């Protein structure tokens, strides 16, 4: 018969029994279950976190097999949110999982964040509008929000709290205006994706070993991704979720970040005062934009 304290007893030593109880009572919201989100959810479940709000509107496909938790021959065409819910419940039958199978929207955002201790961002890289809305609401509600993006065979992490630099101030996104043409709106979107990538990963370690840059197509909303980066992202992010919940251990908060790249044997702590307005970031933005323009031609 399942017993929570027996199931997670091997955590004790790294955690105290009181801390394990605290994790049992913790609620996390996970936005997006493709890519890193499934891994984040499962690692949190194995830490003993027992309350989840999870959101994804997509189903598994063959193209997910190389990297996504839950993707296998038996789950093709099945809702990602259902598969991850089932996986969490098989790890911890006492867990509570609220499944937002239609995804996150401005209409259900407050419900998604209700009672949440930490928000885990794993939305699709191209879902900027709802990502911005979630981070904005988290700041208003005082909910710590954390993102760890897989970058090649490494991961880059940022934490936003009530006392850190805000998500909007850090990334410096540009909003399209009603007067903009369709071409201008597309360009603004592409530029904002670049801002997000260089903001999450200021050191851009992954650029040194990308073998075929023609596979990076922002306008087609398609970028390469491999499993090692996903697994590393889950380890880094969930370790910091633990620190946020238990309020121990040093936190690296925006405009500071952390990038670990297993391929390059590098661990880099980044610091970008003023976020993407920092001169280094402006230089990186212009460089990547020029490379993409050259690639398109």
Q: Would you name each region that the model predicts?
A:
Residues 36-37:
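Hydrophobic/small residue at the entry helix of a nucleotide-binding pocket
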Residues 167-229:
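A conserved mid-domain beta-alpha-beta active-site/ligand-binding segment of alpha/beta enzyme cores
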Residues 77, 81-118, 122-131:
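A structured beta-alpha segment of the ubiquitous adenosine-cofactor-binding alpha/beta core
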């Amino acid at each position: 018969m399942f017993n929570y304290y027996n199931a997670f007893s091997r955590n004790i030593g790294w955690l105290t029994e009181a801390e394990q109880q605290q994790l049992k009572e913790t609620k996390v919201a996970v936005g997006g279950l493709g890519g890193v989100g499934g891994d984040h959810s499962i690692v949190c479940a194995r830490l003993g976190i027992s309350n989840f709000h999870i959101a994804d509107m997509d189903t598994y496909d063959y193209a997910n097999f190389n990297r996504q938790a839950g993707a296998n021959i038996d789950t093709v065409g099945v809702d990602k949110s259902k598969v991850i819910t089932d996986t969490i419940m098989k790890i911890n039958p006492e867990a509570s999982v609220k499944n937002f199978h239609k995804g996150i929207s401005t209409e259900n955002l407050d419900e998604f964040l209700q009672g949440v201790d930490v928000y885990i961002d794993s939305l699709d890289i191209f879902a900027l509008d709802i990502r911005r809305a979630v981070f904005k609401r988290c700041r208003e509600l005082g909910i710590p929000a954390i993102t760890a993006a897989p970058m090649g065979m490494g991961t880059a992490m940022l934490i936003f709290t009530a006392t850190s630099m805000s998500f909007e101030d850090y990334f410096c996104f540009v909003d399209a205006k009603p007067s903009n043409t369709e071409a201008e709106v597309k360009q603004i979107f592409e530029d904002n994706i670049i801002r997000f990538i260089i903001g999450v990963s200021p050191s851009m370690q992954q650029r040194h070993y990308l073998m075929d840059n023609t596979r990076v197509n922002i306008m087609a909303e398609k970028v390469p991704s491999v499993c090692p980066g996903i697994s590393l992202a889950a380890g880094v992010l969930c370790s910091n979720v633990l620190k946020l919940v238990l309020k121990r251990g040093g936190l690296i908060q925006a405009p500071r970040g952390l990038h670990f790249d297993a391929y390059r044997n590098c661990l880099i702590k980044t610091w970008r005062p003023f976020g993407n307005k920092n001169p280094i970031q402006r230089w990186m933005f212009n460089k990547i934009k020029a490379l993409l323009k050259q690639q398109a031609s």
